């Protein structure tokens, strides 16, 4: 943990084989060795290590620099993080002992990921709202800034009103994760589900406020939405 905190090492995460196993992919762990393929491993661009899981929820750590570990970058519309396919050919792994004894370790890891993605979406939505408000203050039409028109005001107000409760939802989900274990999974799922829906609405409204410019790469709204 100290090395992670000091940025000496960094991790990519690939748990999709446990969440939604595929017939043409998967990891087989045999003692301290593992073979197979893990798809949609996130944050692999600068990772020195990867946390991977098999279909049973057993997690292991592999080193990106090992010769038996092959990284294949995947093409994605999401430019905020790198997605990879990790191919293991009898690679050395460190199995997380707790994960082989109980499903609690993989469950908590997945729930933590849900909460972090929800928080990520809240931040992206706030950026889109801020950009929309600033644009509405500057863009002029019919001799007036468009922010003075009631329809534009309504869109900005609706985005802000829908997003504000999401801060509390994410905060409560994070609180439950450590302090209310019986509600942790429900709140993790609820926060990710609700914030995702609100974020889609914010992206749509933000694009409407920007008009045709909202569809261009110049303003970058699509970056935050994706």
For the regions a language model picked out, list residue spans one by one.
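FAD-binding core of flavoproteins
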Residues: 2-130
């Amino acid at each position: 943990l100290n090395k992670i905190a000091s940025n000496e090492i960094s991790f990519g995460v690939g748990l999709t084989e446990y969440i939604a196993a595929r017939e043409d992919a998967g990891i087989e762990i045999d003692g301290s060795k593992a073979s197979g393929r893990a798809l949609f491993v996130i944050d692999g661009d600068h990772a020195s290590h990867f946390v991977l899981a098999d279909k049973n929820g057993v997690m292991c750590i592999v080193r990106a620099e090992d010769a038996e570990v092959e990284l294949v970058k995947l093409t994605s519309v999401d430019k905020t993080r790198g997605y990879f396919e990790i191919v293991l050919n009898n690679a050395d792994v460190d199995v997380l002992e707790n994960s082989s004894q109980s499903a609690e370790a993989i469950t908590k890891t997945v729930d933590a990921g849900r909460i972090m993605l929800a928080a990520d979406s809240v931040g992206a939505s706030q950026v889109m709202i801020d950009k929309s408000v600033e644009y509405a203050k500057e863009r002029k039409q019919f001799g007036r800034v468009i922010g003075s028109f009631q329809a534009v005001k309504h869109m900005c107000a609706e985005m802000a009103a829908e997003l504000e409760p999401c801060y509390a939802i994410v905060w409560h989900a994070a609180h439950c994760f450590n302090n209310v274990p019986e509600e942790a999974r429900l709140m993790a799922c609820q926060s990710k589900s609700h914030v995702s829906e609100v974020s889609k609405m914010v992206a749509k409204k933000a694009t409407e406020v920007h008009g045709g410019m909202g569809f261009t790469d110049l303003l970058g709204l699509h970056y935050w939405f994706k």
